[in-house]
């Protein structure tokens, strides 16, 4: 659940940071597993910085899908979420960031939106980003334009991470960032000596998919998950009017 303060800040800014969700032991396990995959060094472009497939790397990763502290926040923002896509990011010192993107007026506007009607939020795709290493002030990492999820004007094409309106969100290892994809966001070039590591889960409303190609979940993975986690892997659909939206999950 969101506290009253967190709910206010999410509506105001488009994001909220949950502090110290993972403890040092959990962080160590996740990072050791990543190290053991012998992934190629991260490159200069975003395409060369991402990795995926980690849901097949064991409970240290699958447990993040519906983490007891984070998932109630997700279901507050998306009463019937589905996992639309997921990936990790690794950056080394000197690698470039990702340009500002997102927003209801951009190409992704059909899936990334924010509305508020009759006292209730209606969110499009919600991203949950787990910081596996420190991303502190001056080091680089996630940046955004707070409040832009409610903007009625397109993002100025000339703006990048140096624009005055752009805000860096510092995170310590173990923190979790939850944000609406309609908020303009991007990545500041990485300056720290250590590797930036994050894993991201993008949850969509249950009837919505970002791409016409859905993730192909292996039967072996499905069988290893709890009923609630399996429900997150369902394809998009609209509920019949008689169905209770809360039935999708084992609470």
Language-model segments: residues:
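Active-site rim elements
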Residues: 58-61, 164-165, 186-188
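A structural signal for short, well-ordered beta-strand segments
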Residues: 86-88, 128-130, 199-203
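Short hydrophobic-aromatic micro-motifs
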Residues: 17-18, 177-179
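Catalytic core of non-heme Fe(II) oxygenases with the double-stranded beta-helix
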Residues: 95-170, 208-213
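Short Ser/Thr-interspersed hydrophobic loop/turn segments at strand-loop and sheet-helix junctions
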Residues: 135, 180-183
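Non-heme Fe(II)-dependent double-stranded beta-helix
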Residues: 1-13, 18-119
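Non-heme Fe(II)/2-oxoglutarate
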Residues: 73, 176, 183-184, 188-251
